[in-house]
Regions:
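Short, basic/glycine-rich phosphate-binding loops at helix/coil junctions
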Residues: 1-6, 80-89
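Contiguous, glycine/small-aliphatic-enriched amphipathic segments in soluble metabolic enzymes
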Residues: 1-56, 100-181
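Conserved beta-strand scaffold positions in the cores of enzyme catalytic domains, especially
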Residues: 70-72, 81, 181
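Helix-enriched interaction subdomains in cytosolic or periplasmic regions
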Residues: 46-52, 76, 80, 89, ...
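Mobile beta-alpha loop/short-helix "lid" or hinge segments that flank ligand
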Residues: 74-82, 86, 122-126
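Active-site glycine-rich loop that binds ribose-phosphate moieties when present
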Residues: 58-62, 66-68, 88-112
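Short, acidic/small-residue loops that bind anionic groups at enzyme active sites
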Residues: 48-76
Length: 182
């Protein structure tokens, strides 16, 4: 169509993305499909077309009237990753490392892992280099991440450990030491 200019975002293209998502949502709600898989979307174009949500994930959550925690879950073979933050500028990430957000991510990892038949081994990544070096290079690990892990383990008995330095955590995870990385 004339409305499409290769390499440029537009409201027309965003409306096409939204129409595809809406069709998939309708089919899922009608029980005609059991899941939705889609390729890359352009959030900017979708916003030009009138989407008022931060991401397609929030769009889905609203469409399905979801009240429980949700986020993008990525799978690679037997390894799952769950995000504590998502689709935010790096300058906002530290402020989003809260007990509530971290608990939601851990809970989602546990529930999703269990639904796949696992008793998941969950590893929580640090935010700062070298796990913050005991507060010398960032306090998120000391003030939020470690205490939250300890509370969750005490309250639930789930197999959650960390924080681990993010630069080396995936070596262990890909070797099979963990099922979920938060």
């Amino acid at each position: 169509p004339d409305q499409v200019v290769y390499g440029e975002a537009s409201a027309y293209c965003g409306a096409g993305d939204l129409k595809q998502l809406d069709t998939a949502i309708e089919l899922c709600k009608a029980g005609k499909i059991e899941g939705i898989v889609f390729g890359p979307l352009h959030k900017g174009a979708m916003k030009m077309a009138g989407m008022h949500y931060e991401s397609e994930h929030t769009y889905f959550a609203h469409a399905f009237d979801l009240k429980t925690p949700f986020c993008e879950v990525n799978m690679m073979d037997d390894l799952m990753t769950v995000r504590t933050t998502s689709h935010v500028p790096i300058s906002e990430v530290s402020g989003m490392i809260t007990e509530s957000n971290l608990r939601e991510a851990i809970e989602l990892g546990e529930i999703t892992g269990e639904s796949l038949g696992h008793k998941p081994r969950i590893a929580v990544a640090a935010l700062n280099p070298h796990c913050g070096e005991f507060g010398l290079c960032g306090r998120e690990e000391v003030d939020v991440i470690q205490p939250t892990i300890e509370k969750v383990v005490k309250e639930t008995g789930w197999n959650v450990t960390g924080p681990y330095s993010a630069d080396t955590l995936f070596i262990s995870a890909l070797k099979g030491d963990f099922d979920v990385v938060v």
